[in-house]
Amino acid sequence: MPAIRHLSGLDNGFDQPILVFGASMGAMHAANLFFRRPDIFDSVFAISGIYDSDIYFPGYMDDVLYRNTPCTYIPNMPADHPYIRQYNDRKMLFVVGQGAWEDELLASTRRLQSVLESKGIHARFEYWGHDVDHDWPWWYKMVETYLPQFID
């Protein structure tokens, strides 16, 4: 990350904000990177992600899984954790459809929204229609709709 910040500074005259973005499994990775390092990443844009581990590992938890499952570690953050302020100073957008192959992702996104709200973390959640499937054509439309909002 230091090299990216340095090179962007050389090309632009100042450090550029760094957005983490992903769809499907990439959304989970983007969200996890952002939540674990809000000091590095300025924003997160996650589409159709799963943010808890129960879907893949029902009833199982170890330290590695815990540290990589936002719906598990965020509830245990103290109310005065400095990351909470940092989260609220940054842009967060989570988008999911409600069509084919989105059921588990929709439920996980709603759980993440509930977790964040319970901690006073102000993220934006967008729920697209029941015709919006877990597939690239829809993700392209979501990117076209929302990515410009991250570019200042």
Per-region residue spans from a language model:
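Non-catalytic cap/lid and distal C-terminal segments of serine-dependent acyl enzymes
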Residues: 1-152
